[in-house]
Regions:
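N-terminal secretory signal peptides that target proteins for export/translocation
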Residues: 1-14
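Beta-rich carbohydrate-recognition modules and glycan-binding surfaces
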Residues: 2, 34-218
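Intrinsically disordered, low-complexity terminal and linker regions enriched in polar/acidic
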Residues: 16-18
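Short beta-strand/loop turn elements enriched in aromatics
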Residues: 20-21, 88
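Bacterial N-terminal signal peptides
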Residues: 21-32
Length: 218
């Protein structure tokens, strides 16, 4: 009788050890255990690499000095603005007046067909700048077409940041920021030959943004 009990106890211990071994093999799937089949290692895919290409280097005095302003007085308004190379970038500053239905100011770079070559295939455009807490707008265009593409970006006062603007979120507009139904729905970065920065949306009062560069992320 005692021999039977000892045999049963030994059998139970063997079964329990086997169960623990199988459980261990299941848990440690990357370790070969006896005759158990080793699980395949899962390889996580890497995020695609990106490259930032500068399309307007406004940290260089010579390039910044080629930028000019256009404000609402062309439409009877009284807003004012100026540009200057200051603090290592293009300082675009002025005052927005709502008199005579005005309310916008802008600065733009020269026509440059090389912008499109640099920006071809871009997934986003970036504006690196020190803002003032107001919302600005990046406008890009192909000078051979009557439409442009725009996207707003809200700045953080006193902070230097790069504002990433996805290409697929640019909206086509006409000369007066009105709808442009004849324009392709999606911006083709390879067609860009001019960039501009606007402040509008009736943001009355003084403003200032210092732009270091505008880039394309490819």
């Amino acid at each position: 009788m005692s021999a039977d009990i000892g045999y049963q106890s030994s059998s139970w211990k063997i079964r329990r050890a086997s169960a623990l071994l199988i459980g261990t093999c299941t848990t440690l799937s990357l370790v070969a255990c006896g005759g158990a089949v080793q699980a395949e290692e899962t390889v996580l895919s890497k995020a695609p690499e990106t490259t930032d290409v500068v399309i307007a280097d406004l940290g260089v005095a010579g390039e910044a000095e080629e930028w000019t302003t256009m404000n609402d007085p062309v439409m009877g308004g009284r807003s004012t603005s100026e540009v200057a190379f200051d603090d290592g970038g293009l300082r675009f500053s002025g005052n927005i007046s709502l008199d005579n239905n005005g309310g916008f100011a802008s600065t733009r770079g020269p026509l440059d067909p090389d912008i499109g070559r640099k920006a071809a295939g871009a997934r986003s455009l970036g504006v690196r700048a020190e803002g003032d807490g107001k919302t600005y707008l990046l406008k890009v265009r192909d000078s051979d077409q009557p439409w442009s593409y725009v996207q707003r970006f809200a700045t953080e006062a006193g902070a230097v940041r790069t504002y990433a603007l996805p290409v697929d979120r640019f909206e086509p507009v006409g000369m007066r920021m009105d709808p442009a139904p004849d324009a392709p729905e999606t911006l083709d970065p390879s067609t860009i030959d001019q960039v501009a920065v606007y402040i509008l949306d009736k943001q009355q009062g003084p403003f200032q943004i210092i732009i270091d560069r505008i880039s394309a992320t490819i």
